[in-house]
Amino acid sequence: MDALDRVVKPKTKRAKRFLEKREPKLSENIKNAMLIKGGNANSTVTQVLRDVYALKKPYGILYKKKNITRPFEDQTSLEFFSKKSDCSLFMFGSHNKKRPNNLVIGRMYDYHVLDIIELGIEKFVSLKDIKNSKCPEGTKPMLIFAGDDFDVTEDYRRLKSLLIDFFRGPTVSNIRLAGLEYVLHFTALNGKIYFRSYKLLLKKSGCRTPRIELEEMGPSLDLVLRRTHLASDDLYKLSMKMPKALKPKKKKNISHDTFGTTYGRIHMQKQDLSKLQTRKMKGLKKRPAERKAEDEENKSKRIKKN
């Protein structure tokens, strides 16, 4: 049995807290990513991993030592690192004659590989080569995907989902306008994926809404899709399954229209409208003569009944 697969009993309170953090939760922690370079990674691949790590901070772990592994042939080492560092996302960089400047991006489910997609780097401009101001660490990016392939082709559709998982950052309930600081733009065109990073500049516009300008921040990559190893539809659905406790409870007799208006249905007993007290107006009051005639009529009806 593997050392990491054993049931570990904590001996101290600190170890107990550490293991409790890794236990399954209804609302999971922010997904961390590990960035690993292969045994033959060159300077380009190493710099790409460093730049992606700079964008992912503090939700990333950069492995500085080279690791000889092949993600498509054997995933045991990746699963070992995933369990050891509690990371559900990974990026692996390598370089060889057959596949130069190679990036493998993937994600885990229950510490087992779910999806792996291989990308080739054709052009790269580093974060440090673009001499502009950068965003502070931990800034949540805006993600933009352009191109029909992201919605049509299954490989590109799964790649889009994987990139959203990789760069989305923490889930927040509210966002202030000044917190929108940079954009990650992915374009799928003619079999290539163009990855660009821009800083958002809010300029004065003379009204309440500011004028927006984009300034390239880096890194910039031209990628091409190579190999893929995708999870089956059943396993993918299982990984997306939401716990029952988080599912919103259905409310009976409530419906919504296209404009978001809420309609409710109330069940009541039949009301006797003859006893309903209505508002009396002076103009509708009966005159004494009319009242006297009505009383006499009622009296005659009672006598006839008797």
Swiss-Prot record:
Keywords: Nucleus, Ribosome biogenesis. InterPro entries: Brix (IPR007109), Rpf2 (IPR039770). Residues 290-300 have a biased composition (Basic and acidic residues). GO terms for biological process: maturation of LSU-rRNA from tricistronic rRNA transcript (SSU-rRNA, 5.8S rRNA, LSU-rRNA); protein localization to nucleolus; regulation of signal transduction by p53 class mediator; ribosomal large subunit assembly; ribosomal large subunit biogenesis. It is found in: Nucleus, Nucleolus. Transmembrane segments: none annotated. Residues 31-234 form the Brix domain. GO terms for cellular component: nucleolus. Residues 277-289 have a biased composition (Basic residues). Pfam families: Brix. Residues 268-306 are annotated as: Disordered. PROSITE patterns: BRIX (PS50833). GO terms for molecular function: 5S rRNA binding; rRNA binding. Component of a hexameric 5S RNP precursor complex, composed of 5S RNA, RRS1, RPF2/BXDC1, RPL5, RPL11 and HEATR3; this complex acts as a precursor for ribosome assembly. Involved in ribosomal large subunit assembly. May regulate the localization of the 5S RNP/5S ribonucleoprotein particle to the nucleolus. Belongs to the RPF2 family. This is Ribosome production factor 2 homolog. The gene is RPF2.
